[in-house]
């Protein structure tokens, strides 16, 4: 079974929008790709990230073009969304493997 990591929405936003620690987030993401680590996320993840991008636009922290570009890049980032049943089982298996 290849290694997996569950991605947090705040990390994904840092990949898409210049924020403090965006460079570190990009380095981390790239290292996961290079190490062939599968990026997984819960079912609500895409909605949480899209909502954050939209909120930044509404609050005028992003231009319309920046928001559109961030969303477009988000759709091609490369992560696997797990539905709740699969996510629950995966979390259980990961905890078991880690001895948690």
Residue ranges and their predicted role:
Residues 50-78, 85, 90:
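Active-site-proximal, substrate-binding regions of enzyme catalytic domains
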Residues 33, 75, 96:
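Anion (oxyanion) recognition and catalysis
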Residues 2, 78-100:
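Active-site neighborhoods of divalent-metal-dependent phosphate/nucleic-acid chemistry enzymes
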């Amino acid at each position: 079974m290849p290694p997996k990591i569950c991605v947090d929405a705040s990390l994904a936003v840092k990949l898409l929008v210049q924020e403090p620690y965006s460079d570190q987030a990009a380095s981390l993401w790239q290292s996961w790709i290079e190490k062939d680590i599968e990026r997984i996320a819960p079912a609500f993840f895409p909605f949480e990230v899209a909502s954050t991008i939209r909120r930044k636009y509404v609050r005028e922290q992003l231009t319309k073009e920046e928001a559109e570009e961030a969303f477009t890049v988000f759709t091609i980032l490369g992560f696997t969304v797990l539905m709740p049943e699969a996510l629950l089982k995966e979390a259980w298996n990961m905890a078991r493997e880690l001895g948690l």
